[in-house]
From Swiss-Prot:
PROSITE patterns: NUDIX (PS51462), NUDIX_BOX (PS00893). Disulfide bonds: none annotated. CDD domains: NUDIX_Ap4A_hydrolase_plant_like. One of its GO terms (molecular function) is bis(5'-adenosyl)-pentaphosphatase activity. Transmembrane segments: none annotated. A motif (Nudix box) lies at residues 52-73. InterPro entries: Nudix_hydrolase (IPR020476), NUDIX_hydrolase-like_dom_sf (IPR015797), NUDIX_hydrolase_CS (IPR020084), NUDIX_hydrolase_dom (IPR000086), RppH (IPR022927). Its EC number is 3.6.1.-. This is RNA pyrophosphohydrolase. Its cofactor is a divalent metal cation. Keywords: Hydrolase. One of its GO terms (biological process) is ribose phosphate metabolic process.
Amino acid sequence: MDTDINLKNLPYRRCVGVVVFNHEGKVWVGRRLTKYAHADTEMSHRWQLPQGGIDEGEEPLDAACRELYEETGIRSIKLIKEARDWFYYDFPQKLVGCTLKNKYRGQIQKWFAFQFTGKLSEIATNPPPDDNKAEFDQWKWVDLEALPSIVISFKKHVYRKVVSEFRGSFRCL
């Protein structure tokens, strides 16, 4: 059977994505560990926002808070906005079989924006809290508008939508 036909029959994995604004309106990004980055990903394009799967029976907002904590240690947040729509991306053909046990053609994501209200000492990525697996080797705050230029190519269109969705959402506390 043709791989392209198989791909089209695979479902999208339901996920959440998280935008965290600091008090200056900058956005938290983490640089993917080499073992999670794809072989041809340039170092400058290994950055991404926290994201992850929605567990069976879990509400997207709860999943967003859980994933944010598991990946970053961040719990001190205030919800700013939920994206109106779900955004999706397909995995590139070369990654099929290497990503998520070949069960999905890509991911469909509900995005949330939060205000970080804690102290920087709360952020823990390597290692993250509660024996979670580290996914990031570095983190930094960047301008929201810069996101599409620092992520892997097959996610750029989603990040453009995220920027458009949450542009102007940050308000100083």
